[in-house]
Amino acid sequence: MVQRLDVARRREPHTQRRHDERAATGPAPAGPVRHDALLAPAPRTPGPHHVLAVAVYLAAAVAMWSHVWFGGDPAHTITCNCGDTSQQVWWLEWFPWALSHGHDPLLTNAMWARLGGVNAITNTSWMAPAALLWPVTALFGPVASFNVANLLAPVVSGWAAFVLAGRFSRRVAPRLVAGGLYAFSPFMLRNTVLGHIDLTVTAYLPVVVLLGLGLLTRGARPVRTGLVLGGLSVLQFFTGVEVMAITAVTVALGALLVVARRPRLVRAALGPLLVAGSVAAAVAGACLAYPVWFFLHGPRHVQGPVWPVVSSAPWRIVDAGANVYSTHTSLRAVGYLGPQGPSTDFLGFGLLAAVVLSAPLWRRRTSCALVAGVGLLAWVLEFFPARAWASLPVLSSVELVRFALPVSLCVGLLLAASIDAWWEAVGRRWRTVSDAARRGAARGAVVALSAGAFVPLLVTYSLPFTVTTARVPAWFAHDAPRLARGTAVLTIPFAYALESQPMAWQAETGDAFDLVGGWAFVPGANGVDDELMSPPGGAVAALRALSGDPRRVTPAVQRAVRAAVAAWRPLTVVLIPGDARPGALAATTATLGVPPRWSDGAWVWTFGPTSRLGPVHPL
C-alpha cells in the first residue's frame, strides 16, 4: 500500500506537488489554495456551464435592448440616427459593399469624397465584425447588423471572462458574477449605447490572459497556443486596435509582476513562452505587415492622438457623476438620447469594499495578488499625466479612461475569488451535520452581501436603453439611388463630425452615392494630426460656416464654397429643411447663384460635369 502511494505521488504534476508541500509546511491560507491560476492547470469547464453562461448574458443583453427586440423593429430601431451611432452604421454597410464591388477595403472615397477619402484602418472600421455580419446586412440592412452586434458583443465578452474566472473559482455562480461585471460594466454600457463595437467586443483581453496562464502552468501546447494567439490578434486588429493596445499594456504589466513575484515559474516556462510567442508573431506578422504599415504610414493616416488627451480622476471609480439620470447632456450629440448613466470608469463603493474586505481570504493566492496589482496599476493609468501620455507613439490614441476595461476585469476576477473563498470558509467553520442550519444561514448571508455589493452600481443604470426609429429623408430613400455613379452629395448642414446623420442615410440606402464630408479621423490642416486636433480650413471651414450660422456668411466664405462646388462636379447639393438652420436656404441659394428645385421633401441643386454656377449674391 505504501509503495502504491509513493508511485502515485511521483506521478503527480510537479507544480501541484510543490504547491501541496508548501501548503503542508507553511501557514495555512484562509482561501481555497489548491485552485491557484499560476500553480496548476485549470479544471475543465463542463459544456452545460458554458451554455448557462451564454444564456444568462444573452438574457441580460436582450433585457437591455428589449425596446429593439420586443417593442421595435430591429431593422429600423436604433438609439439615434446621429453622432457616433451613424458612423458605426456606415462602417457596417460599407465594408461588405466595398468587397462585393471590388473596392479597396483599406481606403475609401465614399466618405470625405472630393476631400481625399478616409483611411479605414485609422478609423474604427470593424472589418471583422462587418464581415461576420455581412449576411445580416445583406438581408435586413446595416441597422439590423448594428443591433445584432450590440446584442452579442457583451455576450461574447462576458463568456470569455467567465472562462477566465474558472482559474479563480471552481463554482459557476462566482464565475457568472465575474463575467457579468466585465460584460455589463459602465465602460461597456456607455460604449454599447453608442455602438462602439470596437470597444465592446473585448473577449481578446481575457482570452490572451488565459493563453498566457496555460503556458505558465505548462498545461498548453506552445505551437497551438501561438497559432491561436496569432489568429486572434489578426481578428482583433480588424475589430479594434485600441482594445489590442489596452490588452498589450495590461499583459505587459501582468508579465512584469509575474517576473517579480515568481521568477522561477517564468524561467521554467520560458521555452514554451518563446515558442508560442514566435509562432504568434509569425502568424500575425504575415497577415498584418501591410495593414500595420497602412495604419501607420498609408494614405490619409493620422499621427498622434485623435482626441485631446485628458486624465481621469482617482475618485471617479466611486463617483457615478452628476448627470446620471439626465437626458440633456453631451451624450445626445454623440448618439444616445437616453439618460447619461454613470461615468465610464465608475464601479461603486460596494464592489470595491467587498474585494478589499475579502483580501485576507485570497491574498496568499499568487494569482489573486497579481490580478490585484494589475488592476491597481491599470486604475493608476486612468489618471496618468495627460501631457506625458500624449507624447507616446501609438498609445497616445488610447483614451486614458478606457483603462477602466482591465480594471473591471480584475475586480470581477477578485470578486469571484472572494465569493468562492467565503463559501469555503463557511464550509470549514460549520462542517458537521449538526451545523447545517448555521452553515446554510451563513452561506445565505454570503449570497446576500455579494448581491448587495452591486447595489451602488446597479442603481445608476437606466434600463432598457432608449431607442428611436431610424428616419431616412424621402429624397435619400427614393432619389439618391437613382444618381449617376460617381456623383457626390453635399448636404446642408455639412456632414462634419457629429453632424453625421447623412452617413446613416447613405448606409441605409446601400451606399448609392459618395458623401462629401463625414465623421472620421482624417488629416487636418497640417496634414499630420487629426482634423479635431488641427481643424482644416479652406472648403471644409467655409461649409461649416455656411451650415453653422447661415445669416452671417461672409463673401470669403461664399467664394470658398463656390470654388469647391465647381471643382467637385458632378455634385448634388441637398438641403433638408427640418435639419438645416434658419436662413440656410437663402444663404445657399445666394452663394450658388442658381435656384434649387423641390424634390421629395428636399431642396436640391444639381451640377453636372459642365454645369456652371450663377452670379453670387452677397448676404
Q: Where are the regions that the model predicts?
A:
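Start-transfer (signal-anchor) and selected internal transmembrane alpha helices
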Residues: 1-70, 272-281, 440-448
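Membrane-interface helix-loop-helix junctions at transmembrane boundaries of multi-pass membrane enzymes
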Residues: 220, 262-275, 355-388, 428-439
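Periplasmic/ER-lumenal interhelical loops and adjacent helix-loop junctions
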Residues: 79-99, 273-276, 280-360, 400-401, ...
